[in-house]
Amino acid sequence: AADRTSSILLLDDSTIVVANPHSHTISFVDLYDQVNGKIEIDVGKSPQTLAYDSALDRLWVTNQAENTLTIISVSDKSVDGQIETAESPFGVVFDDSVAYITNQKSNLIQVFDLNNFTLIASIPVSNSPRGMSLSKNKNTLFVTHFSSGEISVIDTAELSVIKTISLGSRAGLTQAFVIDEGEAVAYVPNTMRNSDNKNLIFDNTVFPFVSIIDLNELIHLRGERIALDIIDKPVGMPLEAALQNSILYVANAASNDLTIIDLKSKKALAHVEVGSFPSGIDISESGREIYIHNSLDGTISVVDTEAFIVSSVIESTVISASSAVLNGQKLFHSSDDTRMSKDQWIACATCHFGGEADNVNWFFPDGLRSTPSLIGATDTGPFHWSGNLDEIQDVEDTIRKLQGGTGLVFGSSNCLPSCDTAEKNAGRSSDLDDITAYLGSLKFSTAYQKSNNKNEVDSISRGRELFFDKNVGCSDCHKPPFYMDNKNHMMPQVNSTSKSLNTPSLMRLSISSPYLHDGSARTLPEVLTSAPLNSVHGVQESLTSQQLTDLIAFTEAIEPPTQMLVEREYSELTVPQKFDSLAARAKVDFEINLEYD
């Protein structure tokens, strides 16, 4: 059974299995016959992590873009069936009888019985649950939160959160949680975001850290955290890690490298270059090899743990995306290319991981700005809150000014005096056009099955009528199908000034907080109740409390057009074979003990 989330697993000393998120497959690789010993199986869209149930010889795979799990028979190398999950499943780990699933966009940990797939519980947690690790005694489940840098501590008997540990309000991109049982600590790679900085440049915006958690006291040891740029060199996006005795291996996804740390001295032992976007690690039983999953190359780097060199590279898949889209995706997620970033500090994906938003407000030359999602961006220009980019290729200016890259085009960035008034950048660089192609390929995940509760359905219906009511005026600017109008408008501010701002899309609004250009509204009700009276958002006096509730219910339910949604691998789900003779796990009482043992 897997005790932590991972995209790559050694099943035994000869077989490794890896999730291929960009091929929508998993691969079994025979380490003794890497040429002919690969078996690749279609699963669902964007498989992220996997876990092996040795008792039933089954592999569970999370398909993040289509909200399903695929169950694989390992002996037959075939699909047993699928299970529907909540929205955006990422992590899967097992204890003896249940599977825990993180659902990143519905903020739930789902608990399924391993024998008959019964949904035992749905545990509500804070935003963006992602990685997990299970304590050795299986009493405690630790859950990382990708956007906030928080750790939820879950009692596995009570199936409830007993504590939340914060790495600090600026921590994010928090995925791995690596437990050191002997020292009773855990190591958490993360990126610290200097969002209070009003002069953002490449080397003062984000910082790579490994934070340390005391597992007895369940506290963050702030003074003990390891600054990777100090002990090694500037690296981009430390995302995954693995522990071997007193050595910690940290995969830096954006800078495409591995930082190897001696935990006794807290100094770097070595720095190893690997493939594109390393996002998973596993260690051989002998400890002589480390296997690094390079998700954007479709390869596995094998690292010799004595010489600290890459001894071989194994192909796990041939990524099916077009060459333009794949190249654009690699550039977007890379801080390793000097054209994209100076000294490996920051990538486009540092703030727009997977093309989405980081839920952070940043100071830019035109003011405090909330990071927007880029999914659907090619249909919703102009770009930036100020609407000052008239084409995606104008990100050339951001690459140069913020990321410190030399740029993807020769000569001017074509953003003087402003990007929208200068010559076009489209066609000047195939690489810049490829980034645009990648962003144009992004789609929203499959729509999650919403509640059929009559009261909720009725509230959404009433909200729809209000939204399109000319007296309320929402649809004057937020027009279907993208719920925006591709225009700028002068928007009154609470300080009696006005700003020219581009109309944002309202698609998938419920997961895009904070709201407004400056992130000043933490919730949707704040958008409507804190706006200046008689402004386009200032409807608080003209609508009743129930009408406000209904209007918000509708805006939260707005879905993208079908062509902007991921199409599921399976049109119908096949329920895997159940072992009904084995009863579903019964929930038992357990006295909570915060002492870690």
Please provide the spans of the model-predicted regions.
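Periplasmic c-type cytochrome electron-transfer domains
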Residues: 135, 147, 154-156, 172-202, ...
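Conserved loop/turn at the beginning of each blade in beta-propeller domains
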Residues: 1, 43, 85, 125, ...
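Short coil/turn linkers that define WD40 beta-propeller blade boundaries
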Residues: 24, 34-35, 57, 67, ...
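Beta-strand-rich domains and repeat architectures in extracellular enzymes and scaffolds
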Residues: 1-25, 236-239
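A short beta-strand motif characteristic of beta-propeller blades
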Residues: 1, 35-41, 78-83, 118-123, ...
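Conserved core beta-strand positions within WD40 beta-propeller blades
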Residues: 15, 58, 98-100, 140, ...
